[in-house]
From Swiss-Prot:
Protein family (similarity comment): Belongs to the ATP-dependent DNA ligase family.
Organism the protein comes from: Methanococcus maripaludis (strain C5 / ATCC BAA-1333)
Binding of ATP, residues: E250, R257, R272, E301, F342, R432, K438
EC number: 6.5.1.1
Gene that encodes it: lig
Keyword Hydrolase belongs to the record: no
Xref: InterPro entries: ATP-dep_DNA_ligase, DNA_ligae_ATP-dep_bac/arc, DNA_ligase_ATP-dep, DNA_ligase_ATP-dep_C, DNA_ligase_ATP-dep_cent, DNA_ligase_ATP-dep_CS, DNA_ligase_ATP-dep_N, DNA_ligase_N_sf
Protein's name in the database: DNA ligase
CDD domains, sorted: Adenylation_DNA_ligase_Arch_LigB
HAMAP family with a match to the protein in the record: DNA_ligase (MF_00407)
């Protein structure tokens, strides 16, 4: 399949803002592949359309930043001066390369047009290049691709290298296109995607005529992690009880979400970003290996513990453990980790359609019970032990007063609050559900992405000291909600400045526009209405709590979250 045929439809998708038209154009693309291509082509275009060449569960990236792409573009014959001027004018490196493509060295008239397969496999190889001369090799490969490409192709190649297609397409739109073209139930398609995290595989199976509901490759599998189910905000414990009848309360831990997979004695542990962190936490791996369980997927919260007090250490200590590549055992002696398991998603078969109460029974057979109302003495004793693997502390009750006691106790041992779950609910990967709620004592912190950075003043003059922060809407468009600089230490500023220099897209002098890759957790005095920002809200006195290296743009808060927090706080006043 010619890459140009794909790019023509990408161009149509980019030029419309209407969701239904984007869906129709992707249906047109599927039909073109059905007639002229191979099943694997739908796999490739499904991933490329959302700016990826790897499936999400693979947790691989092309690994090329804007600076390296600029270096590659310069070797094609486009001058740095012209390129920077065009980027400033258009705000997009892809469009800039397209507009300047007449300056790119010409190849022989007898050269073959670029194929989709060739472009796709070439970009996958980029991620594998390592060693002393790796940057030169990457520049040469990118340069050769751009020289072979026509102007429109060069636009999309440049964007894909940065994993940002800028065409307004997302997974739900592709799934809607699959549903329309192949005449399959949209909910079934969404559910299968949720347990595979592989839009390309799903597309390839559909166009090949697979019975997707009974295809074992499309079922939940050990060592293929899934996105976590997410909780809703709730104004109060009483409101959550109304929604969930007799709910299951659990301590909301001050830690990082993890998935533990085990099969044939092998253990892998994944972060909420689906990163394989197994090698960073060897002591947890060894403990899990000791337990007589196999062919299982567990979910829990990994907490860095102060064993002398039984309380959690700062969240950054968890990230220090997860990032560690050397002297891991020495770091393990300094920072003890513990996992509180709260769900089992697979045990010899998929369990996500099984009610929570039954999944919890399986979990407790493996790790024991921790019922707060009847086992408090045991729980408080074990908190101070060196035990590494626990079932989460829980309370089943519809008594709001008892629930508030449990909430206050959870705070007293250093954690964030409580989770409130419907015991009859299934597990819905990657969705924010109305069967699970969270309650915290203070305003909900927000996870935001940095979209611009500005050089600091005074003591901060050597770093980027102020950061424009944004949340996303349902279509994954970003909306600015404020600027933040307070709360960052000099070490934070130094680390952020280094990252900014690697991911800046456009230099405006004292300010730079960035790829949306830095996630910050921020607190604030309140959310207020504001005409300054298009979204209509702004954070008052935002302050950085921590840099969330365990999260990506997929994990940031939404415009709906902001509105909900605003409404909750307004009703409390």
């Amino acid at each position: 399949m010619l890459f140009n045929d794909f790019c023509k439809i990408l161009d149509k998708i980019e030029k419309t803002t209407k969701r239904l038209e984007k869906t129709d154009y992707f249906v047109e693309l599927i039909d073109f592949i059905k007639t002229n291509g191979k099943p694997e082509n739908l796999k490739q275009v499904s991933q490329i359309t959302i700016g990826r060449v790897f499936a999400e569960f693979e947790n691989k990236e092309i690994g090329i930043g804007p600076n390296l792409l600029l270096e590659a573009v310069k070797t094609t014959g486009i001058s740095e001066k012209d390129l920077k001027a065009e980027i400033k004018k258009t705000g997009d490196i892809g469009t800039a390369v397209e507009n300047l493509s007449s300056n790119i060295k010409q190849v022989s008239l007898f050269s073959q047009p670029l194929t989709l397969e060739e472009m796709y496999s070439t970009l996958k190889k980029l991620s594998e290049i390592e060693g002393n001369s790796s940057q030169k090799k990457k520049i040469r490969i990118i340069s050769n691709l751009l020289i072979l490409a026509n102007p429109v192709e060069s636009r999309y190649i440049s964007r894909l290298i940065l994993e940002d297609m800028r065409i307004g397409m997302n997974i739900p739109t592709i799934l809607a296109s699959f549903s329309n073209y192949f005449n399959v139930n949209k909910e079934n398609v969404e559910k299968i995607y949720a347990v595979t995290n592989d839009i390309g595989l799903l597309g390839e199976k559909l166009i090949s005529g697979s019975d997707i509901e009974n295809d074992s490759e499309l079922h939940l599998k050990v060592f293929r992690p899934i996105k976590p189910m997410l909780a809703q905000l709730t104004p109060s414990i009483e409101d959550a009880i109304i929604e969930t009848k007799i709910p299951q309360f659990e301590t909301k831990y001050d830690g990082a979400r993890v998935q533990v997979h085990k099969s044939n004695g092998e253990v892998k542990i994944y972060s909420r970003r689906l990163e394989d962190i197994t090698n960073s936490v060897p002591e947890l791996v060894e403990e899990i290996k000791k337990i007589d369980i196999d062919n299982i997927i567990l979910e829990g919260e990994c907490v860095a513990m102060d064993l002398s007090s039984g309380k959690p250490r700062p969240f950054q200590d968890i990230l220090r453990r997860f990032r560690r590549k050397y002297d891991i055992n020495k770091m393990a002696e300094k920072i003890a980790l513990r996992i509180y398991f709260f769900d089992v998603l697979y045990y010899n078969r998929g369990l996500i359609d099984t009610p929570l109460r039954n999944r919890r029974e399986i979990l407790e057979k493996l790790f024991g019970t921790n019922d707060w109302d009847t086992e408090l003495e045991k729980i408080e004793k074990e908190i101070l032990s060196k035990k590494m693997l626990f079932s989460s502390f829980k309370l089943n009750s519809d008594d709001p007063n008892l629930a508030k006691e449990f909430f206050n106790w959870s705070l007293s041992i250093g954690h964030e609050g409580v989770m409130i779950k419907n015991p009859d609910a299934p597990y819905t990967p990657g969705s924010r559900v109305k069967t699970m709620y969270k309650v915290k004592p203070t305003l909900e912190n927000l996870d935001v992405v940095v979209t611009r950075a500005k050089i600091g003043m005074g003591k901060r003059k050597d770093w980027y000291g102020s950061y424009e922060i944004s949340v996303k809407d349902d279509e994954s468009n970003l909306h600015v909600i404020g600027n933040v600089g307070s709360g960052l230490t000099e070490d934070d500023l130094e680390r952020l400045t280094k990252i900014v220099n690697e991911i800046k897209i456009e230099d405006l002098g004292e300010e730079v526009i960035l790829e949306p890759k830095i996630v910050l957790e921020v607190t604030y005095e309140e959310i207020q209405t504001s005409e300054k920002y298009e979204m209509g809200y702004a954070l008052r006195f935002p302050r950085v709590v921590q840099i969330r290296e365990d999260k990506s743009i997929n994990d940031i808060n939404t415009l709906d979250d902001v509105k909900k927090i605003y409404d909750i706080e307004r009703n409390r006043k």
